[in-house]
């Protein structure tokens, strides 16, 4: 299970840094929005996947999904 602390550690990282950190910890990831544009995503809930929201190249939100 992805911890709250791990999710919080992603905030203010670049998208690339967040991807690397997720890979190092064995988690899948996806960007669900970037600079206010929401992407079409599947609605399945996965407890091993992190959803990123990106603004100006930095992760502003990270949650399990």
Language-model regions, residue ranges each:
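Exposed, flexible binding/inhibitory loops of compact, secreted disulfide-stabilized domains
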Residues: 1-65
């Amino acid at each position: 299970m992805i911890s709250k602390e791990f999710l919080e550690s992603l905030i203010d990282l670049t998208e690339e840094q967040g991807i690397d950190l997720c890979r190092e910890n064995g988690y899948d990831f996806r960007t669900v929005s970037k600079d206010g544009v929401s992407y079409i995503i599947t609605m399945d809930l996965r407890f091993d996947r992190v959803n990123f929201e990106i603004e100006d190249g930095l992760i502003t939100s990270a949650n399990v999904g």
